[in-house]
Amino acid sequence: MTHQAADPFTRHDWTLSEIIEIYKSPLLELIARANAIHREFHDVNDVQKASLLSIKTGGCPENCGYCPQSAHHKEVHLDRIHMMKPDEVLEIAARAKAAGADRFCMGAAWRSVRDGREFDSVIEMVRGVRELGLEACVTLGMLNAAQAGRLKEAGLTAYNHNLDTGPDYYDKIVTTRSYDDRLDTLKAVRGAGIEMCCGGIVGMGESVADRAAMLQTLARFDPHPESVPINALVPVEGTPLGERERIDPLEFVRMIAVTRIVLPASRVRLSAGRSVLNREAQVLCMVAGANSIFYGEQLLTTPNVGETDDDALFAALAPQCQLKDALPTD
């Protein structure tokens, strides 16, 4: 069951102190509470599989401290990929559908969408993906209402644009784009009637209050974001955050549980950083409310859990566990 009707769980008026109190509650109690809410809103055996295809890699003018695609981080060794052609992308999409996919996600390392040939190519990709009978999702940076309208007209299902962290910690991570810029993009997405995919990253040095503030911001959207990716920082050598220690797995489980409580109807997606979780920790995340994973050995430019390992994980969970496939990265 998935719904956002008026109920005792769905709220848009969470206070920061309320979310922090939930976050600091005993872990077993927290997981039990999150699981009860998860069962109220979702089929626990419905776990979506989604993957990202980078249609343009590297050279981004933003200075996000975690991202190897930033042109500011000169010491990062990254193979840049120029914009893929629509026929290349649609060939991969067709193979994905033949393998049972139902959603195809495309990401471009842009600061913002610019009208012109490349955006026209993305529109062509979205139309082609929809004509194949697949859902289409893109992450392209900032965009305005008119551009969101074009994507909606082309049939776009969802737009990903993460907040990254809470507003008070945001400028410690990126200074080339403001928090309000991100919120304006999300408003344009919602205004066009496109599903919102928006979450953040934990393990960047932020406080519990910063994590809570990010969730509070997401909860203010009415309705809540349809999907919320929660990423654990993957430190990449050469980036400003490249020397940070990885987040403790149980702390990541805690974040998943709080996200499920604050955003009960959203699909909570285990995203970057899942590769360092053993399968028991991943299952605990699902008990705590995660009901989507990114599938494939790479997420844009960072490593992910291998497909064979994921297949074995879900075979162990339950024969009836339903996996809604998205594109395996090429």
Curated annotation (Swiss-Prot):
Matching entries from InterPro entries are given as: Aldolase_TIM, BATS_dom, Biotin_synth/BioAB, Biotin_synthase, Elp3/MiaA/NifB-like_rSAM, rSAM
- Entry's Gene Ontology BP terms: biotin biosynthetic process
Which keywords does this chain's UniProt record carry?
Answer: 2Fe-2S, 4Fe-4S, Biotin biosynthesis, Iron, Iron-sulfur, Metal-binding, S-adenosyl-L-methionine, Transferase
For the Radical SAM core domain, which residue ranges apply? Answer: 45-274
Q: Which SUPFAM superfamilies match?
A: Radical SAM enzymes
| Keyword 4Fe-4S on entry | yes
- For this protein, the Enzyme Commission number is 2.8.1.6
What cofactors does the UniProt entry give for this protein? [4Fe-4S] cluster; [2Fe-2S] cluster
Asked if DNA-binding is a keyword of the record, the answer is no
The record ties this protein, via NCBIfam families, to: bioB
HAMAP family membership: BioB
Q: Name the protein family.
A: Belongs to the radical SAM superfamily. Biotin synthase family.
For this entry, the protein name equals Biotin synthase
